[in-house]
Amino acid sequence: MVIIRLSRKGSKNKPFYQIVASDNRKPRDGKFIEKLGFFNPISIEKSKKIFIKTDRINLWMSKGAKLSDRVKNLLHKYKK
């Protein structure tokens, strides 16, 4: 099953996350199908903090992909 989740990047104590569509059997930071955006929790500017390709996420969800809890919360905040 395809799941849309966060993949951790960045260095120690400076996390940066990519929002990716991947198979749920793959490791968190492993191979993914498509990159759908990013989330930078450390950034102060809102424009550099989060970016989500909502059209692509909607496409994956229509094909049966599930959202992780954290991505679901981020998507809700991004739409506001």
UniProtKB/Swiss-Prot annotation:
What is the superkingdom listed in this entry's lineage?
Answer: Bacteria
Give UniProt keywords alphabetically. Answer: Ribonucleoprotein, Ribosomal protein
Query: In the UniProt record, does the keyword Nucleus occur?
Result: no
Q: Which GO terms describe its biological process?
A: translation
Q: Name one GO cellular component term.
A: cytoplasm
Question: Does the entry feature the keyword Ribosomal protein, yes or no?
Answer: yes
Give the matching SUPFAM superfamilies: Ribosomal protein S16 (SSF54565)
Query: Which GO MF terms are attached to this record?
Result: structural constituent of ribosome
Q: Which residues form a coiled coil?
A: none
Name the protein family. Belongs to the bacterial ribosomal protein bS16 family.
Which HAMAP family does this entry report, sorted A to Z?
Ribosomal_bS16
What is the name of this protein?
Small ribosomal subunit protein bS16
Source species of the chain: Wigglesworthia glossinidia brevipalpis
Q: Which gene encodes it?
A: rpsP
